[in-house]
Amino acid sequence: MRNVRVTAAEASRADGVSPMDGVSPVDGVSPAVAGFPAAGASSAAGVSPADASQSGTLQSGTLQSGTRVAWAGGGELMFEARGLVKRYQLGEVEVLALRGVDFLLRSGEFVVLLGPSGSGKSTLLNILGGLDTPSEGFVRFRDHDLSQGDDDLLTHYRRDHVGFVFQFYNLIPSLTARENVQLVTDLAAAPMRPEEALELVGLGARLDHYPSQLSGGEQQRVAIARAIAKRPDVLLCDEPTGALDVRTGIVVLEAIERINRELGTTTAVITHNAAIAAMADRVVQLSDGRVASESRNAVKAAARDIQW
């Protein structure tokens, strides 16, 4: 990597987290803080993220029209959230973003959180990702209570265990695709090579291109590569296709699909686009801060077969 200077605001985007969140991946938190296992060393039950797809947690097979057998369960419980309430105070007005949400997510699962704007999707995802804490209730990541975590614990948790993908890419304009990913891999304990991560999302031939030389879909795939290069336990995606046209959005969904399938990365995607729900193992519908319904897809649609 060439010697490049970046500002503090740019550095805070290196892990896909907006500078508005006040999260910096270069804040000096020790990899052994708060009792979490070392990043990338192993996942629970001794299964590495790279081996997860071979562990029996995922059961898949090729069906006609490119569909795949849905996740069959059996993975460890990665997230348990109970009774989540989130209040925001806007002047004298109290806004309830979540109203008693229960949510479980198991290792290797692909879940779509579906609902209109204001339904609580992003608030729930932010709490799962350690970007926010609930006003009431609790959320556990494995054996760790994130709802009681201090800033050091949550910063370490985000940096070593969670990959974020947002609607906006947050790439550093002065760095190439490879260098944007390497900002994260330089901080992780057992990362992929940047080239490997970019190859996974179909950008092996675009390593040395700058964001301005990439299309919107390609920039989003760089953001996905950056998110998964540190081998996170979970990939959290907030409207990853929201700024893209249908054709480009499908390519981005194929990248997310491949990461879940080949790496066994637990994946949660929030969207207002009901068509995307067809590619999930499980679909959770939110409305007015509550879980309105939950269903499973017996057979998952391939991303390339989705139309909207």
What kind of region is each of these model predictions?
Residues 1-43, 47-87, 293-308:
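ABC-family P-loop ATPase nucleotide-binding domain
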